[in-house]
């Protein structure tokens, strides 16, 4: 794996091969415990196992106070249909609750929200995608995490992404590319 001091990185197992043993690098028990602590924190903040490629950014997030963390994370905001909203509100384990904000249910919905669920956003009555959801994530997750992007984009037309603008632009570009591909193949 990489030689960047302090960088935590994961790789696909099918790409893993032992080429040579580097016996010159040994961590002390304290360094190992610190790396394990940072790994756990990065997994919590990222909602996955992709941690970007910059050790300094990782360290900054791991050591940030709650106030500093808010400024370092990127908010992804989207609105969704009832079908996706029901699915997401029942599966709140993917991202830390402290980094999520969900829509309140529409009037007449008999769903009993869990006590700790961050249900604070106001739904948009009469809209096809009335349920806003916000998730605060590290910038590298939003920009390059394949699993996060597959999760978000996988809902297709059941989700309208509102921010950040870079993700809105990417969805628009992908839609145009797909439309062009399918239109030209007929």
Mark where each language-model region is:
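Short, acidic/hydrophobic/Gly-rich beta-strand patch recurrent on exposed beta strands
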Residues: 1-2, 151
